[in-house]
């Protein structure tokens, strides 16, 4: 994401102009947008025209509109973002108050205006515009004849290539067809790796499969690299890490990311940091339950006692339609940071973020036990009953 301009007043009202450059930038933009915001962007509008002879036709015209946002739709697979709203600025093709849907496009700037920019939204802009936040983990999830080449970014998992090759079964006395097809499959996966993985940024490439597929593939890849003097692969050989998965489908990537060998190798990446933080929470919940809380009311009371060491919170909560509820989560984040606590904002598109979502989306590891907190909550809930 590229920041073109930022104009904010003292009361944090104002606007920012951004250019989405990567598919993931659409996810960041989705998290920036809220109902009631003002969005100005280039769009296509179907306009009816009347010729001098009186015949009516329609043309698709590119124009720039400013909408008051009413609905936001994000397709996580295609990384497409559509924003519906009413036109709030004069335009020769679109009447004031008319409805329109803008589909934000890569490499086309947009301007987003808010009555108040909170700290969480501003932090997301900083992260989205920081080159260091690009995908630092890649993964090849495979089985015989099927492979997915993925990039694991700080916010989501992107499938960059899917390789499918029909592998005939081995026949007694004749394995040549099977072997040729397998070699063709391996070669296509190698090409996908070279095409889609930026080794200057990526710290680790996971190769995950059932059985011995990953070992056989890696042997083939590096033997060919030696034969062809492929310096790109040979110089980055140490970045490849082989792990087990139950299949070659994309959804099993979570198995690979939770592998202990992987979490230790990826200790300095955000995705691995989220996995470790959630694992630490579960361990604390099991062994010292008075130092592990989840649910907004419990976590807020722990924060009042300045007991929070690490706050775990899902980015999904900051997309809440109710302004007061959203402000409550922002206030919690700001307060924990003021009290020298660590805040980890989890992506709901990551495995760990999904798990946190099952725990209400907010949890905390405490500095010290707060046993009476549970009792107070039980008493207040029984009084309400």
Swiss-Prot record:
Gene3D superfamilies for this protein: 3.30.1330.30, eRF1 domain 2 (3.30.420.60), Pelota, domain A (2.30.30.870)
This protein's UniProt keywords: Cell cycle, Cell division, Cytoplasm, Metal-binding, Translation regulation
Cofactor(s) named in the record: a divalent metal cation
One Gene Ontology CC term in the entry: Dom34-Hbs1 complex
Major location (coarse): cytoplasm
Entry-linked InterPro entries: eFR1_2_sf, eRF1_1_Pelota, eRF1_2, eRF1_3, Pelota/DOM34_N, Ribosomal_eL30-like_sf, Transl-rel_pelota
Localization annotation: Cytoplasm
Identification of the protein by name: Protein pelota homolog
Organism of origin: Gallus gallus (Chicken)
């Amino acid at each position: 994401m590229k920041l073109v301009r930022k104009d904010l007043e003292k009361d944090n009202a104002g606007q920012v102009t951004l250019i989405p450059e990567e598919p993931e930038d659409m996810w960041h933009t989705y998290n920036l947008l809220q109902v009631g915001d003002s969005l100005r962007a280039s769009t296509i509008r179907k306009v009816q025209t009347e010729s001098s002879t009186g015949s009516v036709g329609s043309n698709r015209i590119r124009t720039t509109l400013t909408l008051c946002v009413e609905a936001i739709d994000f397709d996580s697979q295609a990384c497409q973002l559509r924003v519906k709203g009413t036109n709030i600025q004069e335009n020769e093709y679109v009447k004031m108050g008319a409805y329109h849907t803008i589909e934000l496009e890569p490499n086309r700037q947009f301007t987003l205006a808010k009555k108040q920019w909170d700290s969480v939204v501003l932090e997301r802009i900083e992260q989205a515009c920081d080159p260091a936040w690009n995908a630092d983990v890649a993964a090849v999830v495979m089985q015989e004849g099927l492979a997915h080449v993925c990039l694991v970014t700080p916010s989501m998992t992107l499938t960059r290539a899917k390789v499918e090759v029909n592998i005939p079964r081995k026949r007694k006395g004749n394995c040549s067809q099977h072997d040729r097809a397998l070699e063709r499959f391996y070669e296509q996966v190698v090409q996908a790796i070279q095409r889609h993985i930026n080794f200057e940024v990526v710290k680790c490439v996971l190769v995950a499969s059932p059985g011995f597929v990953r070992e056989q593939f890696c042997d083939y890849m590096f033997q060919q690299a030696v034969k062809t003097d492929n310096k790109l692969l040979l110089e980055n050989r140490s970045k490849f890490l082989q792990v087990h998965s139950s299949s070659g489908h994309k959804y099993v990537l979570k198995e690979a990311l939770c592998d202990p060998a992987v979490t230790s190798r990826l200790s300095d990446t955000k995705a691995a940091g989220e996995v470790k933080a959630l694992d630490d929470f579960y361990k604390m919940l099991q062994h010292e339950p008075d130092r592990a809380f989840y649910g907004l009311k419990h976590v807020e009371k722990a924060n009042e006692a300045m007991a929070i060491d690490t706050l775990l919170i899902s980015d999904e909560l900051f997309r809440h339609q109710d302004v007061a509820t959203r402000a409550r989560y922002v206030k919690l984040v700001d307060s924990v940071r003021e009290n020298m606590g660590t805040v980890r904002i989890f992506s709901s598109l990551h495995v760990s973020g999904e798990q946190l979502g099952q725990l209400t989306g907010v949890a905390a590891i405490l500095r010290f036990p707060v046993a009476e907190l549970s009792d107070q909550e039980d008493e207040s809930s029984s009084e309400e009953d």
